[in-house]
Amino acid sequence: MAASMFAGAVRAASGILRPLNILASSAYRNCTKNACLNSILSSRHFSHIQTPVVSSAPRLITSVRNLTCGQTATVLNRMALLLPNVLKPPVRTVTYCSSRKGKRKTVKAVIYRFLRLHSGLWLRRKAGYKKKLWKKTVARKRRLREFVFCNKTQSKLLDKMTTSFWKRRNWYADDPYQMYHDRTNLKV
């Protein structure tokens, strides 16, 4: 009773849920083919399996009973195309542009959190140096306060997020980083 109500609710859903309806119904009705379904689910690519396509909606209920493991693979192929867009990790590649001339603008968070040396290297604090200090040891807090260099990918991204104003050489009176601005260990 509950299973038929669930199947009816899933069938009434939009077209996005239709592949899931086929997959759930076939898994429920074809209990003897669970081993085949598990082997298909565990594999990475489903493109080598060719199956007939269900064409009309009225025949959907009758065709669900006759589903084979190959047809569930077709459903998984359709769903696999949607997954990379959903599961992408968030990436900060924002560069602000002015509304008047369309020039790039500086992202202020970069200026506050990072220090750019004139050689193009970027300095930053280690992540978490201000967080949950009550449960960190003194040695760990000292290690977190240290400055580290950003890698090449991060440096290129930070250069895109800042304008040329922030890349010029500055001559501060008591600059503690004065000796680090120029690279002296490069062999020409």
From Swiss-Prot:
Domain of life: Eukaryota
Intracellular or extracellular location(s): Mitochondrion
Pfam family, one: Ribosomal_L35p
Protein name stated in the entry: Large ribosomal subunit protein bL35m
Alphabetic keyword roster: Mitochondrion, Ribonucleoprotein, Ribosomal protein, Transit peptide
InterPro entries: Ribosomal_bL35-like (IPR021137), Ribosomal_bL35_sf (IPR037229), Ribosomal_bL35m (IPR019338)
Species this protein is from: Bos taurus (Bovine)
GO CC field: mitochondrial inner membrane; mitochondrion; ribonucleoprotein complex; ribosome
Biological processes, Gene Ontology terms: translation
PANTHER family linked to this entry: 39S RIBOSOMAL PROTEIN L35, MITOCHONDRIAL, LARGE RIBOSOMAL SUBUNIT PROTEIN BL35M
Recorded family membership: Belongs to the bacterial ribosomal protein bL35 family.
